[in-house]
Amino acid sequence: MANIKSAIKRAELNVKANEKNSAQKSAMRTAIKAFEANPTEELFRAASSSIDKAESKGLIHANKASRDKARLAAKLG
């Protein structure tokens, strides 16, 4: 455990950030799985939106976001 006050604060902030980032990534994965189970236009838009949000927050790389959206679009038809 950290002994320096600022290091303790950073550790606490890192825990909060990790929880927030994990929740966002989980929501993205859930939206993708929902689309793959039932590929509709509405679910495609929801999945694309969640992928874009994860990309803009730095959770996934821009290339991965593009690749994932392209694969979903191909499944849409």
From Swiss-Prot:
Which Pfam families does the entry link to? Ribosomal_S20p (PF01649)
GO biological process, any? translation
Question: Which cellular components does GO assign to this protein?
Answer: cytosol; small ribosomal subunit
Keyword field:
Ribonucleoprotein, Ribosomal protein, RNA-binding, rRNA-binding
Q: Name one GO molecular function term.
A: small ribosomal subunit rRNA binding
Determine if Ribosomal protein is one of this entry's keywords. Answer: yes
Taxonomic superkingdom: Bacteria
What the entry lists under PANTHER family is as follows: 30S RIBOSOMAL PROTEIN S20, SMALL RIBOSOMAL SUBUNIT PROTEIN BS20C
Protein family = Belongs to the bacterial ribosomal protein bS20 family.
Per the entry, what this protein does is: Binds directly to 16S ribosomal RNA.
Q: Which NCBIfam families match?
A: S20 (TIGR00029)
Protein name as it appears in the record = Small ribosomal subunit protein bS20
